[in-house]
Structure formats: structure tokens, C-alpha cells
């Protein structure tokens, strides 16, 4: 199941770029982004049904966009209808057709689609939901722009609800490992000494992405993480007292995210070749 922005007629006229059927192409796009980037969610009808009927949990579905491939060699791009026969005679170009790309996830409140989260926020959502399978985290190392890429191979999340007086806190702990995938212009010269600082930057970036998603969901008053459902299962007495007001309480709860990802080795990174 997926949602697409825009007119239904435009979506129905979309063309597959690599597969024989558009439905197969959509399935492959979502699947690849789930497995290799953790920037998409896989939602079937059963999960939508559960999100609609289970208290303290909202529905999240893949969000697709229509776009025209920029590559001139794309099979769905249109050229002129025929070669020009003279300098002054030229057939008009046909309009370019469009296909789908993943653009994040659609957020529901009850049975209504209310907003979107982008791919980076979707990755934060997937990490907290313990559904991440792998992905790339770019960080800025001694620079204002992101110049080093960390690829995580495993990621595990543990969520614990804590009642501190009248304050409800959800403590999210993330753990995982991976390696450095790429660096720009050889910014890291001595991995043995700079690795601790690099791990710190990676964990800060992961925490930032997760917290941005939490803040967005709280602004929307949509508990896409199922924190309420978790509280219902682990501390039912507390849940019974606040269940009717959860949509108003959720934006006020505190969510702490702590990431502990380990850079196991430097992967394929190396110092750039120098021309002498």
C-alpha cells in the first residue's frame, strides 16, 4: 500500500522505467529503499487495519512522487516524433512521461492522511521502530558540509516508558555497527586517533534524525511510533487513565534518544592519490 501526492489521473498514467508493470516497479522501489537505505516503510492492509483499530498507534504508509527522469536515455522520455528534414521544419516534441520515486512516508491521524515526512525523517522513524536494515548516514567532519559517509549494517532499538512523577518519558536506545563508506578529499588522515570523534558525530547525526521525526509527529499529534500502544501493553494501569486524552498528551511527552553505533572498520576509505 502506498500514497501519492497530486491527481489520481496523473498517477494512473505513470509509466514504469525498468519493469514491465508499474505495480511491480513501485514494489521494487519500496523494497530497495527498505533494505538498502531504511528510507521507506512497508505497509500492508493488515498493518493499516491494526493502526486504525489499536489505540495509541497511527498509520504510516510509503509516500510516492511522480517525476520525469532527467536522463536523456530513459525509456520513458519522449523525443521529437521524427528526425528533422530541414533546418526550418521540425516536428513538435511529445510531452515527457512520468514515473514514481520514493519521497518519504505519509502520516495518518485516525483514518485521514494529514501530512508527509521526508526521507531523512522516515529513516529516523524506521530506526526507532526497530525496522532499520541498513543505510547511509552522512556527517560533517571538520567542515560545514557533510563530507564523510557511515553505512550501518545492523540497528537495534529498545524503548522504555518511564513515569517520573507526573511526567511521562520514553527512553529510546539505539545500537548498531557499520563502517565508513566514503570520505571527501581525504579529510580523515589517522583513523586510529580520529575514530572516537567520528563515532560521536555519527551518533549525534542519528539522534538528530530520530528527534526531528519525533518532533514532527508531535506537531501533528500523530503517534506514529506506537508509544501509546507500548504504554498500554507494559503499564496498562497508567494507560487507562490517559487513553481518552492521548492525542492531547502525546505532544507533551518527553522522548529521549541515545545512539550507540560503532564504526568497526574504515571500509573502502583511503587517502586520495597524489599526483607528483
Which sequence ranges carry the predicted segments?
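A glycine-rich, acidic short-motif signal
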Residues: 1-276
Amino acid at each position: 500500500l502506498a500514497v501519492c501526492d497530486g491527481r489520481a489521473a496523473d498517477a494512473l498514467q505513470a509509466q514504469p522505467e525498468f519493469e514491465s508493470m508499474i505495480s511491480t516497479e513501485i514494489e521494487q522501489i519500496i523494497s530497495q529503499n527498505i533494505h538498502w537505505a531504511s528510507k521507506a516503510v512497508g505497509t500492508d492492509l493488515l498493518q493499516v487495519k491494526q493502526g486504525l483499530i489499536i489505540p495509541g498507534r497511527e498509520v504510516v504508509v510509503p509516500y510516492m512522487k511522480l517525476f520525469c527522469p532527467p536522463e536523456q536515455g530513459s525509456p520513458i522520455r519522449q523525443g521529437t516524433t521524427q528526425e528533422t528534414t530541414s533546418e526550418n521544419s521540425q516536428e513538435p516534441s511529445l510531452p515527457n512521461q512520468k514515473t514514481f520515486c520514493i519521497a518519504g512516508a505519509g502520516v495518518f491521524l485516525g483514518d485521514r492522511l494529514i501530512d508527509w515526512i521526508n526521507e531523512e525523517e522516515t529513516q529516523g522513524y524506521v530506526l526507532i521502530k526497530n525496522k532499520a536494515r541498513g543505510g547511509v548516514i552522512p556527517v560533517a567532519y571538520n567542515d560545514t558540509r557533510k563530507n564523510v559517509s557511515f553505512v550501518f549494517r545492523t540497528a537495534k532499538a529498545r524503548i522504555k516508558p518511564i513515569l517520573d512523577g507526573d511526567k511521562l518519558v520514553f527512553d529510546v536506545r539505539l545500537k548498531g555497527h557499520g563502517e565508513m563508506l566514503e570520505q571527501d578529499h581525504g579529510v580523515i588522515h589517522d583513523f586510529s586517533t580520529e575514530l572516537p570523534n567520528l563515532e560521536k558525530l555519527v551518533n549525534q547525526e542519528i539522534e538528530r534524525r530520530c528527534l526531528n521525526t519525533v518532533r514532527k509527529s508531535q506537531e501533528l499529534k500523530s503517534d506514529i511510533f506506537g508509544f501509546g500502544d507500548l504504554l498500554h501493553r507494559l503499564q496498562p494501569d497508567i494507560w487507562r487513565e490517559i487513553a481518552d486524552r492521548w492525542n492531547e498528551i502525546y505532544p507533551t511527552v518527553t522522548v529521549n534518544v541515545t545512539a550507540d553505533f560503532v564504526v568497526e572498520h574504515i571500509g573502502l576509505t583511503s587517502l586520495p592519490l597524489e599526483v607528483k
